Amino acid sequence: MSSTYETYPVEVAGVKRDLRLFTIKPGIRIAILNILGDTEFVQAVSQALAEKLANQPIDVIVTAEAKSIPLAHAVAVAMKLPYVVLRKSFKPYMGDALRSETLSITTGEPQTLFLDEKDRDLIRGKNVALVDDVISTGSTLQGMRLIMDHAGAKVTVEAAIFTEGDRA
């Protein structure tokens, strides 16, 4: 049994996808990009991003949990760089973690990003690239920037597969 729903067609790095449209609140519909498990798309897009970032001063790739993790991983592998994931929940093993609050466009709720204490040492004094799947309001990037600043890292580039909305 198949369901019928509206989609928005996209093509990125030679790969075509139909993104399902969702109403996130009255009057606002967005096309949802979910790259989790889509290895063909992730590989193509990450290779294209890695090529665009190749001449940038980058020591570490940084992303926020969760949907952009495969992208950050694949970009980091292609560029032979380490990567760091900012978590959305605190775990005791994270030690003296840094935190920053952002607002999620998909849930409309505040969310907190955490930088594990062990990753602070990895990024301190380094040039970092912030990588996300989609930039909508920019609030996640703002939270990521704040954490990088507090950790002593320098954001040299920001990259995403898509931007959407007026503030992206």
Where are these regions (language model features)?
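Active-site-facing substrate-recognition patch
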Residues: 1-58
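PRPP-dependent phosphoribosyltransferase catalytic core
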Residues: 2-10, 142-168
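Short glycine-rich phosphate-binding loop at a beta-alpha junction
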Residues: 58-65
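Conserved acidic residues
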Residues: 59, 126, 156
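Glycine-rich SAM-binding Motif I of class I
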Residues: 69, 138, 142
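Short Gly/Thr/Asp-enriched flexible loops that form oxyanion-binding sites at enzyme active sites
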Residues: 70-79, 145
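Short, glycine/charge-rich flexible loops or terminal/linker lids adjacent to PRPP-binding catalytic cores
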Residues: 81-128
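C-terminal binding/interaction regions
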Residues: 134
